[in-house]
Amino acid sequence: MKNIYFILILCVFASCSDSNRTIYGCLDPLATNYSPNTDIDDGSCIYESDIVFYLDANAAVYLGSQTNQINFFIDESFVGYDSYPFTFSLSAPDCYQPGFISATIQWYESSNTSINWQLTDQSDNVFYDYDQIIDAGSCNQVL
């Protein structure tokens, strides 16, 4: 009988966890890897945001008189293209709305970041070249 109590007590102590353990991770709820159980932020937060490119009617008419294709870039990475007649919108579209070029980007360190976006023609002539601050967890419209 003493052996059963001893084994039972041993099992209880073995199953207890160390509640004093410090958990490192990301404490920012805007980050994709946010962990509410984290005690100390270790700088590992990963942020993500969607971006949609669109032309207003004036830009579509102007570019249509200049080129047959426009290419979209974010930080020198090709995102997509549109061919004449260009898709345009009178108001900012939603990210990933059909007919518009969208992309998702990731970054580290803070909940907003600066990106460089460009719009070129098929011969790599640059029509737009801008820097823009974007926020994590949102749909950012450019152009």
Q: Model-flagged regions — what are they?
A:
Residues 3, 12-52:
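Bacterial Sec-dependent N-terminal signal peptides
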Residues 24, 70-71, 117:
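Generic short beta-strand
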Residues 26, 45, 88-100, 135-140:
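Functionally engaged cysteine thiol sites
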Residues 30, 76-80, 123:
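Solvent-exposed strand-loop boundary residues in beta-sheet-rich modules
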Residues 48-77:
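Short, surface-exposed binding/anchoring microloops in extracellular/periplasmic proteins
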Residues 55-58, 85-86, 120:
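Generic short beta-strand segments
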Residues 73-109:
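Tryptophan-paired
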Residues 114-143:
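Structured interaction patches on ligand/partner-binding surfaces of diverse proteins
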